[in-house]
């Protein structure tokens, strides 16, 4: 499994519907990039100047909102994931 370093978080982005409410199929260039995802793994956190670690405020299994253009897409074992910095996470969805 992927183990993020520092303050990075691995997400499984939630995909949007491929059809509109009216049943129109959307082309791939029209669909918005996902902005919600499930936390798969969390790094140890960033190191502060005094040497202490500041862990990200999320945990595995959380559903989160993130900035639209945040992170890097990676493929691992045939699955696509998004690796983002904790600062790019906007909120936890409850």
UniProtKB/Swiss-Prot annotation:
PROSITE patterns: CHAPERONINS_CPN10
GO MF annotations in UniProt: ATP binding; metal ion binding; protein folding chaperone; protein-folding chaperone binding; unfolded protein binding
CDD domains associated with the record: cpn10
Signal peptide as annotated in the record: none
GO BP term (any one): chaperone cofactor-dependent protein refolding
SMART domains with a match to the protein in the record: Cpn10 (SM00883)
Pfam families registered for this protein in UniProt: Cpn10
InterPro entries for this protein: Chaperonin_GroES, Chaperonin_GroES_sf, Chaprnonin_Cpn10_CS, GroES-like_sf
Cellular component terms per the entry's GO annotation: cytoplasm
Keywords, sorted A to Z: Chaperone, Cytoplasm
Cell compartments where the protein resides: Cytoplasm
Family: Belongs to the GroES chaperonin family.
Functional note: Together with the chaperonin GroEL, plays an essential role in assisting protein folding. The GroEL-GroES system forms a nano-cage that allows encapsulation of the non-native substrate proteins and provides a physical environment optimized to promote and accelerate protein folding. GroES binds to the apical surface of the GroEL ring, thereby capping the opening of the GroEL channel.
Assembly description: Heptamer of 7 subunits arranged in a ring. Interacts with the chaperonin GroEL.
Protein name: Co-chaperonin GroES
Phylogenetic placement of the source organism: Bacteria, Bacillati, Bacillota, Bacilli, Lactobacillales
Gene transcribed to yield this protein: groES
């Amino acid at each position: 499994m992927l183990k993020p370093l520092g303050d990075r978080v691995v997400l499984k982005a939630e995909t949007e519907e491929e059809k509109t409410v009216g049943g129109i199929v959307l082309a791939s260039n029209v669909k918005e990039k996902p902005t919600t995802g499930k936390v798969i793994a969390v790094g140890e956190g960033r190191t502060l100047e005094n040497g202490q670690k500041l862990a990200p405020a999320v945990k595995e299994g959380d559903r989160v909102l993130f900035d639209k253009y945040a992170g890097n897409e990676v493929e691992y074992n045939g699955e696509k994931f998004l690796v983002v910095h904790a600062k790019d996470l906007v909120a936890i969805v409850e």
